[in-house]
């Protein structure tokens, strides 16, 4: 996977945690490969309804490892959740609090929960920690609200999908110094890889599409998004000064 990523010109990877059970493997990989970084968090759809999962102390301990450069992914997802969702709100608040305490930015997921996501980010002081709205699939007003809080917005392979007009509208408007590009692997492989397992190398296809959409050359977009990554995640070590 790493060899294919390197061959595609992808020099750095952030392996995002969706549960603490898998975090150990992510951290081990990040310690072995200097171009791979880790995040620590629990996805809103994981362990649904568990008010104390993860506990404050479990999450606080998880984010302490030096290869962990971010807290998340966290956030709100009402698409597949039903009933009382207070546990999601509490879990999101817990992640924000720890992000502020340790000074590591947030990786935020939001789906069908725009109002509550932005409201909690404002109430809990997420702007103090900073972060990114990852795999963004919502509308421009939501993106603008996050940008106003100092957050970045990350575009995935969804932007290449035929029915993704809303995402393309957002992708055109994100300021260049707040734009990131990602895979969300193993899901959401971009065109021309739809139907296949997504992997880091495919971010090059999304970047190529995004560059054309925004009317810039690929080299410029690749350099800008790489610079943005290291600006957002200052604990990530850049191997070379000018590479991406």
Label every PLM stretch briefly.
Residues 1-244:
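Mid-domain alpha/beta scaffold segments of enzyme catalytic cores
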